[in-house]
Amino acid sequence: NKIDPSLEVHDIVTGGNGGNFAYAIAAPHNGKELTVFKFSAQDEDPICAAQYTIALPSEVNVETAKFAASYAYTANLIFMTSGNKLYRIDLGRGRAIELYTYETDPSAQIVALKFKDSESVREEDDDEETGEYKEKLGMSLGLGINTADKGVVVELQLTVAGDVSREENSICVYEDPEQLIGKIVDISYNYE
């Protein structure tokens, strides 16, 4: 198989099925569709297990978009931010669906997105026998957002389907007018 030479790889993220997949996310310069190559670490799959093409919403700037995937999702879902919006990309259905908008400042930019990682949790801290706690960590998505005058961190609890949960406290906005967060370049989680 030949790869279109006009495609530029914008990111490679890992996730899906316990973290066994890598997704190479490519697009032509200033393009309005993504080509995603799915690579598998599973013996029964070919190394390049699939290729997907997804049309993007018109407001998405692929040059500045950020991407993430989580080990908790087996349904070929990746997540993308552009501007002040978060999208779920359903590779199997070939759709990008808007999940969240930071409405406080329409000119804000989501500059980082990261899922919590169960491998960072000590076994003794996971007191649920079913492992639900670790699974929920993989469905907790943090966003680093820069507005004109400050940084904001938003944490979203997602559902098994990759939607924002409708439960109470499923969207947490971390900001303090007394102690402004400066410009955000990345976010990480500390489990101490």
Summary of predicted features, one role per range:
Residues 1-3, 48-58, 95-103, 167-178:
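A short beta-strand motif characteristic of beta-propeller blades
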Residues 6-17, 58-70, 106-122, 181-191:
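Repeated scaffold domains used in trafficking and secretory/extracellular systems
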Residues 19-20, 74-76, 139, 192:
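Short coil/turn segments that connect the beta-strands within blades of beta-propeller domains
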Residues 24, 79-80, 143-145:
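Residue position within the beta-strands of beta-propeller blades
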Residues 30-38, 84-89, 149-157:
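Structural motif
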Residues 40-43, 91-94, 159-160:
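Short loop/turn segments that connect beta-strands within beta-propeller blades
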Residues 122-132:
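Intrinsically disordered, low-complexity Ser/Thr- and acidic-rich flexible linkers and loops
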Residues 133, 137, 141-143:
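Hydrophobic/aromatic hotspots within intrinsically disordered, low-complexity regions
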